[in-house]
Amino acid sequence: MASGVTVNDEVIKVFNDMKVRKSSTQEEIKKRKKAVLFCLSDDKRQIIVEEAKQILVGDIGDTVEDPYTSFVKLLPLNDCRYALYDATYETKESKKEDLVFIFWAPESAPLKSKMIYASSKDAIKKKFTGIKHEWQVNGLDDIKDRSTLGEKLGGNVVVSLEGKPL
């Protein structure tokens, strides 16, 4: 069921910037988004980039020690969100980077919010072409352990996520 919610152009720009890994200067790399949250606008008509809810590559090792743990802390405990997380992980064969689309719908979120976000998910997913990994998360217990994301990325072949062993 479509909700009539549209996707703001800034959301698409953020996605395209995260998806394309072109050779960049060190300064440009630091400004790349590692993780970003998207929410509904106040009038519930648009999916927008949530202000100040992002992690930049340049933050890692500076204000952010562990990007995965910091990302989990950005998620609101009592409301839904969409998120993009640029996962850096290692399998037994090689190092990889993949974007993960996350639909955060905690049990404690209001029913109306869960319904609007669930019915609007297709609108944002259609704009995020080429995403290999999608994950619906219904509470902190599902996401706080990085090994759960490791399983989503490659089953039991993933040996580390963000440089930390699973």
Swiss-Prot record:
PROSITE patterns recorded: ADF_H
Modified residues (N-acetylalanine): A2
Region Interaction with CSRP3: start-end pairs: 2-55, 55-105
Disulfide bonds: none
Protein name per UniProt: Cofilin-2
Entry similarity comment: Belongs to the actin-binding proteins ADF family.
Cleavable signal peptide: none
GO cellular component: actin cytoskeleton; cytoplasm; extracellular exosome; extracellular space; I band; nuclear matrix; Z disc
Listed Gene3D superfamilies: Severin (3.40.20.10)
Domain ADF-H positions: 4-153
Phosphoserine PTM positions: S3
Main location: nucleus
Upper taxonomic lineage: Eukaryota, Metazoa, Chordata, Craniata, Vertebrata
Keywords from the named record: Acetylation, Actin-binding, Cytoplasm, Cytoskeleton, Disease variant, Nemaline myopathy, Nucleus, Phosphoprotein
Phenotype for V7M: In NEM7; uncertain significance
SUPFAM superfamilies: Actin depolymerizing proteins
Taxonomic superkingdom: Eukaryota
Positions of modified residues (Phosphothreonine): T6
Source species of the chain: Homo sapiens (Human)
Subunit structure: Interacts with CSRP3; possibly two molecules of CFL2 can interact with one molecule if CSRP3.
Gene Ontology molecular function: any one: actin filament binding
Record localization: Nucleus matrix; Cytoplasm, Cytoskeleton
Motif (Nuclear localization signal): 30-34
InterPro entries from the UniProt entry: ADF-H, ADF-H/Gelsolin-like_dom_sf, ADF/Cofilin
Tissues showing expression: Isoform CFL2b is expressed predominantly in skeletal muscle and heart. Isoform CFL2a is expressed in various tissues.
Known function: Controls reversibly actin polymerization and depolymerization in a pH-sensitive manner. Its F-actin depolymerization activity is regulated by association with CSPR3. It has the ability to bind G- and F-actin in a 1:1 ratio of cofilin to actin. It is the major component of intranuclear and cytoplasmic actin rods. Required for muscle maintenance. May play a role during the exchange of alpha-actin forms during the early postnatal remodeling of the sarcomere.
Post-translational modification: The phosphorylation of Ser-24 may prevent recognition of the nuclear localization signal.
Disease tied to this protein: Nemaline myopathy 7: A form of nemaline myopathy. Nemaline myopathies are muscular disorders characterized by muscle weakness of varying severity and onset, and abnormal thread-like or rod-shaped structures in muscle fibers on histologic examination. Nemaline myopathy type 7 presents at birth with hypotonia and generalized weakness. Major motor milestones are delayed, but independent ambulation is achieved.
